[in-house]
Amino acid sequence: MTRTSMITMIPKILTISILLTVLAGCALGGYLPLPGEYQIEEGFAIIRTDSLQVAVRPQSYRGGYRDLNNNFFSVYVMVRNVSTEKVKLPMESFSIVSGGRQYDYVDLEYILSSYHQQMVLEQWQDPFNLDPLQPVDQEQNMEDYYELMASYLSFGDLQPGAAKEGYLFYDRNLNRAQELIFDALGIPVTYSKGI
């Protein structure tokens, strides 16, 4: 290699190095399930009962309303009915214990009303601002609103062989916990925060 070609490669190498460092930094700090009475696959704890298979993982909300991650601690849950009969998924099926305190999930109605209030307030921009940098996109806000509704885990009857999946949201103070126990259908799953 000539000296000129080496000099032109330095910015590329630096860019790749920085990108890899950022990606590695994003991967750290997540919650990982500790071994227990469940399987672990791709960060999910997989719990099996006679009639249900449940996969659980603390995970940032990936929908359009990204501010939700600042306001709540989110957990992604997948539930499959492995029996030949209809099974009821009770609303009290999932909770989190951390620091000796139990946290129940936040109702969807509360989250949606909070988001709706934010959308209404965004419409009333500063009247003295002559050059708003970003106009309010009401259509996008409504899409994000409905996407949030659709991605929330629903409870109730689960038909044979059918599955439900979605997010449950908890108190944001759980983001600071080094360890937490997610109770899924009475089976405790311990998660520890990565380094």
Regions found by a protein language model. Give the residues of each.
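Sec-dependent bacterial lipoprotein signal peptides
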Residues: 1-26
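Conserved functional micro-motifs across diverse proteins
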Residues: 26-195
